[in-house]
Amino acid sequence: MSNSAILPAGVSKEVLLTELRRLSWGAADILRAYARGEQPPHGFQKALSVDNGGEGPVSAADLAVNQWLLEGLSGAFPDAGWTLLSEETAKEQLTEGEPLPAEWLWILDPLDGTKDFLQGTGEYAVHLALVRGNRPVLGVVLLPEADELWIGLVGDDAWCEDREGKRSPVRFSERKELSDLLLVASRSHRDDRLETLIGELQLGGSKAVGSVGCKVATILRGETDLYISLSGRSAPKDWDMAAPEAVLL
């Protein structure tokens, strides 16, 4: 597949991947600092607690990474002609029935798994997805605490790399029978409908993991086989699923 088929004109795949690595590991450093109550890098302020008039570590971390990603992408590629949409800016940008004015769209989730971030489980992630025509073509899923950066280009390749750039391939499990398949499910968003469905499927077992990014990573490592989320208020949104979908495809 040619580069022009998956990226905007004038955007080099290698240049883009280099910038995405820089932004991703920078985001990891920011989130890890906030998670530990330390001074974050890149000029961001240490979080004040809600009791002390601040927004708390979760909101501060979310907003800091949001700013880091938006400024990084717009600054590195000022002429790319894409639109940047994040979970934090969606309410301002999205008007019902009105399409966003660009063929290419970045969908960003600066902190996937806020509850796990707050609880200190380490199961949180950062998502970046480049979308064209309502379909993700490039996805990045960063797991800061695991030092894993999952990258996928639809129709090209998908892999995991660490901070040193060492790559590992996607390893889907070889389990085939329904009774052998392992489910990855939410630790905090479970209801009677999901429990009933899991019981009816009679799978081989299940694993509770926080954040969509961390759940999908267990599938990419071959630790689990499927993820089920039912419709409802807590169901994953576009910024939760776009990047993982690109890596899985």
Indicate residue ranges for each PLM-predicted region.
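An extended, acidic
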Residues: 172-249
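Acidic active-site catalytic centers that drive phospho-/nucleotidyl reactions
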Residues: 62, 87, 109-112, 116, ...
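N-terminal subdomain of lithium-sensitive/metallo-dependent phosphomonoesterases centered on the IMPase/IPPase/PAP
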Residues: 1-111, 196-199
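Residue-level signal for inorganic ion chemistry
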Residues: 31, 62, 73, 114, ...
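Short amphipathic alpha-helical face segments that pack within enzyme cores
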Residues: 68, 125, 243-247
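DPxDG-like acidic metal-binding loop motif
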Residues: 99-163
